[in-house]
Amino acid sequence: MTRLLTLGFFLFLCLLCYPNIITVRNIEELNNANKNAKAGDTIILQNGEWKNVTISLDCIGSKEKQVVIKAQTPGKVLITGNSKLKIGGLYIIVDGLYFTNGYAGKDAVITFRSDNKHLANDCRVTNTVINDFNNPKRMDENNWVTFYGKNNELDHCSFIDKKNMGVLLAVILDDERSRENFHSIDHNYFGRRLPLASNGGEIIRVGLSQHCQFNSNTRINNNFFEDCDGEAEIISIKSCANEVKGNVFKECQGSVVLRHGDNNIVMNNYFLGNDKIGSGGVRVINKGQQVSNNIFYKCRGADFRSPLVIMNGVPNSPPTRYVQVTNAEIVDNIFYECSPISLCEGRDAERTLPPDNVNFFNNVFYNTHDSIIYNVYDDIKGIHFTSNKVSDKISQPLTDGFTKTILPKQNNFSKKDTIRKTGSSVNNIPIAEKEVYASSGTNWFKKYSTSSSKKRISINCLTADEIYKQLEINDEVIIQLTGKEYKINKPFIISKTVQFKSDKKNSIKFETENILSLFILSGKGNLFLNSINIDGKNVKATHFISSDSNGYSDHYNLTINNCSFQNFNYKNGCQNIFYAFKYMIADSITINSNSFINNNCNFFFMNEEKEDKGYYNSEKVFIGHNNFNSQRGTLLNIYRGGSDESTLGPNLTFSHNKLSNCNGTDPLIILTGVQVSNIFSNNFSSCNPSSTLIFYKDLVRAKHNFERNTLTNSGKIEKNGFVTEVVNTIK
């Protein structure tokens, strides 16, 4: 009997110690399983939709026996609605979740703490996807991932389409519990991030300016970044002793920026610009930075986005401004068919300290397209150039430390006689890109693709009611306007791809009530107006077309092609042909080959972002090959206020337009803070003859080209030092 009791007690102890596998079906069961979990347990989330859930984990595992919380099938546990994941325990692994069709509000989607007192340590999130999981409104800021604690890892995850304000991934160093953290961010796929039209669109930020003197020791290794165009900084380092190694940056309009903090390493990375405008590399600020053994391939960024930027500093700078670059090493890098690097960048009335004690050696510049390899904006005597090789085709006189030589043509990656460096080579690009791409992200979620699989239908619409019906279905639609007059009692809401067209033989009359807009471009709206003669005499809507005033995070596009607009009049109620409300962003606005005749209203207004924080309403604006005749009102007003230097836009092209007898009480074209404008090959005749034709205003560096225009009996150009005039004719 004693033996039986002993054996039973022993078996009972074994059962207590043996790890459990628990399947949970809802958040209540998960909370209970988390509460009772012990080291080595596995909690399986049943496949299906988990909507409006806060998953909070504070269980305790061990180094040998982690607590695993995993999807029954990776990608089949859908976290939707207002949902988030909080991890505040020890040795926890989360595996296989899919965040989609939802948002997290002010919180991060994934946070490595359950509350302020319970931080994650030695925890891991893997094989997980966050896809387009944005707050509905663009200005409602949050992160997708925030790191706290120490020794946490994020690996083999995929992140695509963050659109609202806020850094995608932030490493927080707000107290000692999260400093010298040795976090690992590795083998992840960071996919498309569209231009945010604001600061704060980074993919990864390590630290904040107020914590920049602390060591973070975060490792960002072997990740794949693709089309990360949110702002000038893809990775923003604002702390000390971090490393960025073995990553691929493919066609990203930005750079790895060592913004604050010292002794960071950027090594063995591939920056594959592939001739994309704005594709950058590395920007260096502060002390003791190392940039070595990187490949910069066809990176075509300029200024702050140059392939390599060494900044000027501010005298007696606080750590939170621009500390002088000192004791840096720029070594063993290859620049292949890149735009010029930038030395002493940012030189202005404040940033007057050039770099000092910078070792710049054994770098290779292969270039057959450009005449120069670097721009210099201040004294470079503090940069020590040694053993750098440059293609002999470069015509720029070079300082000592650069040798022009015959470098072999890089047209065959398999050749053995091409440029080589120890550990990195242009030859390795296809191999490295393929390997890092294949090993990044999840294996169950398709990486970002530009192709569209949505069905598109074409239908004739005789009345407004028929149009409303087509706008309510999910399919993309081509609406053929077969009627002559459309009576509108509510706006056409465009939240998908919609094309309106006609045969252009007869005028189309839109008759509206006193509504806000006839067309409202909502999130994901792509509106095409094609070959329509529009009579606006009976349009009482304040705006013929506008963006949605709710400021959604999803972008929109507008294209007007081969249309005519006539008889729009503010006296009838229509103030603007197009009006952009605050906070929403268009990827592109294209106005091509149209006629605007006898209208008495404003045309294209994008001037609501008056907070002067660098916000604006459209990344690219193209107005070309149009005829403007007998117009009353401002033609174009674009506003981007403030002194922020982190964006590429707005970018305006205004070309091959003919303007006759166009007048307004304000300038016809008003450009405030536009980063790039090209106004060329236009003909202005009797346009604002006694006033201002075009007005430029800029607080930060901009590039304005005014070229090959003809001005006859037209107003003056109020320009600044950023405007370049070439071959214009003024009569």
Over which residues does each language-model region extend?
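Flexible, charged surface loops at secondary-structure boundaries
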Residues: 35-39, 61-63, 87-88, 147, ...
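Short coil/turn segments at beta-strand junctions that form active-site/ligand-binding loops
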Residues: 39-41, 65, 278, 356, ...
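Surface beta-loop-beta hairpin patches that serve as ligand-binding interfaces in beta-rich domains
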Residues: 398-460, 474, 712-731
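Right-handed parallel beta-helix/beta-spiral solenoid domain characteristic of secreted/periplasmic
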Residues: 21-25, 47-53, 57-109, 132-134, ...
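Bacterial Sec-dependent N-terminal signal peptides
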Residues: 1-21
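Glycine- and acidic/polar-rich repeat regions and solenoidal domains
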Residues: 51-54, 81-86, 100-121, 131-409, ...
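Acidic Gly/Asp/Thr-rich repetitive segments characteristic of extracellular carbohydrate-active
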Residues: 20-52, 56, 447-488, 493
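Short, conserved loop/helix-junction motifs that constitute active-site signature segments
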Residues: 58-63, 353, 494, 699-700
